[in-house]
């Protein structure tokens, strides 16, 4: 029996957004969960979700009158508690989280351009390097990267060798006595991480494999970019069929 790929993709988005288990997919609007799960595994292990997200990102940038690829990028990480164990699990002593970290690379519009998942006990400074290896061939216009003090050292040296400028923001610098002042550009990646964790499947790591964990992050990237294309706020609730 053949199933509609549109319905299968929406089934994956439903899981990412609602955070339910695979067997709880509503049968009325989605194909059997085994079909949706099989396709999700296949797409996660290939570059398909990455390609779809990048294509949507480029469409958003064209709509806003920007170049197709960004010149300014922002990096940050968010930790996920592991619920089921599996690959690459560690303890983040800083945030007191046992699980994984997602290194996220975005542009100034908040669109996701790369994701790298690793054990939470590994240093951001070293684990950001795979991001740079991935994005530089895909984003030839990249000229500068913003990140916080946790990336000072190896990450900065690596970018310097590639002739990409590094900007490290120091918390507390430039703050006024009147109250909190957001750090220039850095607040955008915090906003994107808030959008990511608004998808319940990414509030914690329920996946046993790295490919599945990154797959849900890329699905969220599709969700954010598609929402910007149709004029929907990324944090707004929507129907299941969003693409």
Question: What are the residue ranges of the model-derived segments?
Answer:
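Short alpha-helical elements
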Residues: 1-243
């Amino acid at each position: 029996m053949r199933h509609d790929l549109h319905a299968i993709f929406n089934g994956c988005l439903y899981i990412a957004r609602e955070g339910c288990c695979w067997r709880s997919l509503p049968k009325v609007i989605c194909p059997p969960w085994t079909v949706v799960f099989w396709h999700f595994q296949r797409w996660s292990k290939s570059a398909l979700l990455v390609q779809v997200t990048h294509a949507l990102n480029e469409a958003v940038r064209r709509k806003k009158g920007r170049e197709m690829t960004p010149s300014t990028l922002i990096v940050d990480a968010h930790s996920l508690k592991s619920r089921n164990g599996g690959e690459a699990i560690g303890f983040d002593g800083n945030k007191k989280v046992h699980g994984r970290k997602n290194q996220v690379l975005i542009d100034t519009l908040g669109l996701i351009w790369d994701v790298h998942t690793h054990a939470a006990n590994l240093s951001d400074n070293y684990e950001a390097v795979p991001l740079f290896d991935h994005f530089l061939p895909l984003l030839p216009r990249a000229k500068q990267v913003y990140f916080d003090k946790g990336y000072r050292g190896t990450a900065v040296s690596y970018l310097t060798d590639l002739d990409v400028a590094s900007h490290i923001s120091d918390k507390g610098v430039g703050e006024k006595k009147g109250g909190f002042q957001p750090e220039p550009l850095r607040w955008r990646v915090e906003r994107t991480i808030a959008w990511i964790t608004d998808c319940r499947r990414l509030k914690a790591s329920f996946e046993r494999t790295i490919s599945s964990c990154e797959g849900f992050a890329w699905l969220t990237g599709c969700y954010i970019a598609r929402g910007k294309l149709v004029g929907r706020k990324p944090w707004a609730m929507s129907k299941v069929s969003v693409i």
